[in-house]
């Protein structure tokens, strides 16, 4: 089984061909492809983690959709002053499907 550890959106993700993962928003339109940076490649029994060997390895993903994460609520409160502040946030996300791993 071939899989790779890639850097995507400031995190490290374990991916194989056909996996769909959710990463932080990238400025790529839906249906287009993007390359993810591999940090480690496992090909059967061979494990590659050398940066010079990984320079030729490409992990290609296709953008499936743009999405938003769950809404979180931020509350600020100061005692005895009547100060209250409420704010919401939804993180913009991109769902990608891994199409190929290899040279």
Curated annotation (Swiss-Prot):
Listed PROSITE patterns: RIBOSOMAL_L21
Any one GO CC term of the record: ribosome
Molecular function terms, GO-annotated: rRNA binding; structural constituent of ribosome
Coiled-coil residue spans: none
GO biological process: translation
Cytoplasm is among the record's keywords: no
Pfam hit, one: Ribosomal_L21p
InterPro entries: bL21-like (IPR028909), bL21-like_sf (IPR036164), Ribosomal_bL21 (IPR001787), Ribosomal_bL21_CS (IPR018258)
Keywords, ordered alphabetically: Ribonucleoprotein, Ribosomal protein, RNA-binding, rRNA-binding
PANTHER family: 50S RIBOSOMAL PROTEIN L21, LARGE RIBOSOMAL SUBUNIT PROTEIN BL21M
Subunit structure comment from the entry: Part of the 50S ribosomal subunit. Contacts protein L20.
Family under the similarity heading: Belongs to the bacterial ribosomal protein bL21 family.
Role summary: This protein binds to 23S rRNA in the presence of protein L20.
Protein name: Large ribosomal subunit protein bL21
